[in-house]
A protein has these predicted regions:
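Short, small/polar residue-rich loop motifs at catalytic or cofactor-binding pockets
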Residues: 1, 166-168, 322-324
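Conserved beta-alpha junction segments in alpha/beta enzyme cores
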Residues: 22, 36, 40, 148-178, ...
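Active-site cavity-forming subdomains of large catalytic enzyme subunits
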Residues: 1-51
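Immediate post-signal peptide segment of exported/extracytoplasmic ligand-binding proteins
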Residues: 12-17, 140-143, 175-180
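Short, solvent-exposed aromatic-acidic interface loops
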Residues: 18-27, 186-188, 342-349, 409
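Short acidic, glycine/serine/threonine-rich loops at helix termini
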Residues: 1, 17-19, 25-32, 59-60, ...
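C-terminal catalytic domains of large/alpha subunits in multi-subunit enzymes
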Residues: 9, 34-152, 199-497
């Protein structure tokens, strides 16, 4: 990653040039999308009036690479956040204040035409800075605190199958008082089943445990495009909400006739439809209409992004925002890092299942700490140095610090009950926040992950010899970039919003 930014004396970003060179290994995999993501999502956090992006992915004789948590964003976010820290230091501005002066705002377009709706980046910054007392941090030797922010999409705006079919579909059936929701979305551990059950139950006045789910079975459930790009809560959740609202309208209509009132006077909740138990209303409706079945679908709105080459990567119906502060100590004699605490604030839109949301945040934090402190794909003479999980170092409970999770609800206008993603976003700011904290502790920059003791000691040695106190790449790969297209930026607030 290579980045150059033009900044005014007051800290306002004027222009940015971002270059990416990815080592893709032996095969193509998601190479084009991964490459474009490294440039597309930098603009969802900061206002960048003029932006130039160049990206290339090369084939090498290594294991093939593919997408993982935060697809295409951890590496460029690490580069950009440390880059902004260096700018803040150079112009004598607090790193948090520098970012605040450049944050995107709700209901705008980025320079690459991405649509921003709800945006809690300022709120998550305020909450995490206040909770960690970042502004009052101590300056004792070897102790450091680092800050970083990021954002992530709530599902890809374009489908993986090039057709005009819905991105997600749900069918809701009520028979003899029992409720079954059918959806093709697959719960791979992220808790999407609880989201679908909670959304349907909330609309029907039931408990989530009252909803029977049939998911991930293409023989019974309608199509959902899959569990990727943090899309299931937003897209399948909206489909479930539509199906449940249609079922609610049927039951409320029957209950209103039975009660002799208008549908608007019928209250739904606590297992009741007006004065009737849910089962009673369901039986009455089934006597009249037969088996009750409704469906719901979700298709992202049009015009989420631009029409230039590569614009299909990055658009999303919404974006979540995260901010992290890391507190640590570094031994200047050995470079060993002791993590003390991590604060992470996440703009969730609305938390549908707070326990699951907090679990996702903590999982993202721990995964980010593993990536920044110990995990690496290292090769020597063409051979992988960690060919098994026995050799590949990952964090355990012994290395992990206390994590304070702060949820910020901004109520996205298009999410189900205002909800947004949480599966991937919280990982992203943790990695640069650790490197920033190391610099705060010792005054050296480690511009390469993982940030290991030997790299810290080499940076300290460079500083002692009168150098810049930095460890990282010295030269950018000499690669040929594709011819660039010049694209006019959109209006700041188009009428489409």
């Amino acid at each position: 990653m290579w980045v150059r930014t033009g900044v005014a004396r007051d800290g306002k970003i004027l222009a940015m040039h971002f270059r990416t060179a990815l080592d893709g290994g032996a095969y193509g995999s998601y190479g084009p999308a991964s490459t474009l993501y490294t440039g597309a999502l930098q603009t969802t956090t900061y206002k960048i009036p003029a932006y130039r992006f160049e990206g290339v992915r090369v084939f090498t004789n290594k294991a093939p690479c593919g997408p993982k948590r935060g697809h295409g964003t951890p590496q460029p976010r690490f580069a950009l956040e440390l880059h902004l820290d260096k700018i803040a230091q150079e112009i004598g501005l607090d790193p948090v204040e520098l970012r605040r002066r450049n944050y995107v705002t709700p209901h705008t377009r980025t320079v690459n035409s991405l649509r921003i709706t709800s945006c809690g980046i300022a709120e998550v910054t305020d909450r995490v800075v206040q909770a960690s007392r970042f502004a009052q941090r101590t300056r004792r030797p070897g102790h450091g605190m680092g800050f970083a922010v990021s954002s992530y999409m709530c599902g890809a705006g374009l489908p993986i199958y090039w057709n005009k079919m819905p991105h997600s579909e749900c069918v809701l059936q009520v028979s003899r008082g029992g409720v079954t929701l059918f959806c093709g979305a697959t719960d791979i551990g992220q808790g999407s089943n609880s989201v679908l059950a909670t959304v349907a139950a909330e609309e029907l006045g039931l408990w989530p445990t009252d909803i029977r789910l049939v998911t991930g079975d293409t023989g019974f459930a309608p199509v959902d495009l899959g569990s990727y790009s943090s899309r299931v809560t937003f897209m399948a959740g909206n489909a479930a909400l539509m199906a449940a609202r249609r079922m609610r309208a049927i039951l409320v209509g029957v209950a209103a006739e039975q009660m002799g009132c208008t549908p608007s006077e019928v209250e739904v909740g606590d297992g009741k439809i007006g004065e009737l138990a849910f089962e009673e209303a369901a039986v009455l409706a089934q006597e009249r209409f037969g088996v009750l079945s409704t469906h719901g679908t979700y298709t992202p709105p049009p015009n989420l992004g631009g029409s230039f080459r590569g614009a299909g990567v990055g658009p999303s119906p919404s974006y979540s925002y995260s901010a992290a502060v890391v507190d640590l100590d570094v031994d200047p004699g050995s470079g060993e890092i002791q993590l003390n605490k991590v604060w992470l604030a996440h703009d969730i839109g609305r938390s549908i299942n707070s326990l699951a949301v907090r679990g996702q945040v903590e999982g993202g934090v721990y995964m980010g700490l593993g990536e920044v402190l110990m995990e690496a794909q290292a090769y020597r003479h063409g051979l992988h140095r960690q060919p098994s999980m026995l050799d590949y170092k990952v964090p355990t409970f012994l290395e992990m610090p206390d994590v304070e999770t702060i949820l910020v609800e901004t109520l996205d206008p298009e999410g189900p009950y205002g909800a947004k993603e949480v599966g991937q976003g919280p990982l992203l700011p943790v990695i640069p926040a650790v490197a920033s904290a190391v610099h705060d502790a010792l005054g050296v920059w480690v511009d390469e992950v993982p940030v290991t003791p030997d790299k810290i000691m080499r940076a300290l040695d460079d500083l002692a010899r009168g150098g810049e106190g930095r460890f990282g790449p010295k030269n950018f790969p000499d690669v040929a970039y594709p011819t660039m297209d010049k694209v006019a930026p959109p209006d700041a607030a188009p009428t489409a919003l």
